[in-house]
Amino acid sequence: MRLGRLGVEDVYDENYKFEFGKGNVLRKGSKVAIIASGLMVQESLKAYELLESKPTVIDIPTIKPIDKELIIETAKTHDVIVTVEEHNIYGGLGSAVSEVLAPEGIACRQYMLGMRDVFGRSGKPKELLDYYGLDAKHIKELIIEL
């Protein structure tokens, strides 16, 4: 599922320079880190604003190559990593993060928020985000449960 029909707000200022293969820490928090890409970065930042206990929010603009150093450092300094993607959780961003951490022997709890290997349905983008639990409200609720 891709909801590219929605306009995505710019999360960077005019001085930002894209660096291929490098992720960016957009908000610094503790205990929980949210790693997202694309539209899900915007929803993750909205969830950040709704939460009292602030998570770290990381934008991973490229999945291949992925920023291994940032992911490893994040896993070492947080209790839980939550990946958020408008994609099947199998073979997506969450899997890529797991593939970075497993060979390093880093034991960090991970939760993958995304499509659970189901056929997508049609609808308005915001309604689909809500239906699949990918909007800021659902991200916030998941973080509180962790």
PLM regions: where:
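Active-site donor-nucleotide binding/catalytic segment of nucleotide-sugar enzymes
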Residues: 1
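Thiamine diphosphate
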Residues: 4-146
